[in-house]
Regions:
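Coil-to-beta-strand transition motifs
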Residues: 1, 133-136
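N-terminal strand-loop-strand beta-hairpin
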Residues: 1-123, 167-190
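C-terminal accessory/tail domains of diverse enzymes
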Residues: 62, 134, 146-148
Length: 190
């Protein structure tokens, strides 16, 4: 699945944001905990010297359900993030999965806790995220299995965000893991 999304920080009060988003179909609120892992022996599976993650392994717990995800980020010629290829499956036994991760030699990189308030319209999933220790974010995502012009899709997403008339940042071009790495100055020694 190709996920094409734009992530922006939101500076308005949550009540104003929610009031604006309530015109879309509300899908619910989910509390999530994401634990990211790195491999000390694989350069592609740990932050690079620019504190950027090209590939990551994530364990997500969402309302007592557990998912394992491997993400591969795709960048343009200037190093700007375009989209992620994501491979995800649900699993039942978190304790067994943690044993497998430990046996593989993977190490915990960071944990992100957030509350996701999700809406949908006919094209996008729109998520207001309250991220512990980071703030409020709006993620607008278009998912497809088809070959599409990523830059054109992102232009359309940006137009949609602009139409919301919220006080937001420019596109962040990094995910919450990278923001957390930078905020906490996490460095993985070789």
């Amino acid at each position: 699945m190709k996920e094409i999304e734009i992530l922006v920080e939101v500076f308005d009060e949550p009540s104003k944001i929610i009031e604006r988003l309530d015109e879309f179909e509300f899908k619910g609120i989910k509390e999530t905990t994401d634990v990211y892992y790195y491999d000390p022996k694989r350069d592609t599976l740990k932050p690079n010297k620019n504190m950027q993650i090209d590939e990551c392994l994530r364990i997500r717990t969402k309302n007592n359900d557990h998912y394992i995800t491997y993400k591969v980020d795709k960048f343009d010629e200037d190093g700007k993030w375009l989209y992620s290829d994501e491979y995800e499956t649900k699993f039942e036994d978190i304790f067994m999965l943690n044993n497998i991760i430990n046996k593989l030699g993977l190490k915990e990189l960071l944990t992100i806790q957030n509350s996701k308030r999700t809406y949908v319209n006919d094209k996008y999933e729109i998520v207001l995220e309250t991220v512990k220790d980071l703030g409020y974010f709006l993620e607008v995502e278009y998912c497809t299995n088809e070959d599409v012009d990523v830059k054109e899709v992102k232009k359309e997403i940006q137009k949609f965000i602009d139409s919301l008339e919220l006080n937001v940042s420019e596109e962040l071009n990094m995910g919450k893991p990278e923001m957390m790495i930078r905020k906490n100055n996490i460095v993985i020694e070789d």
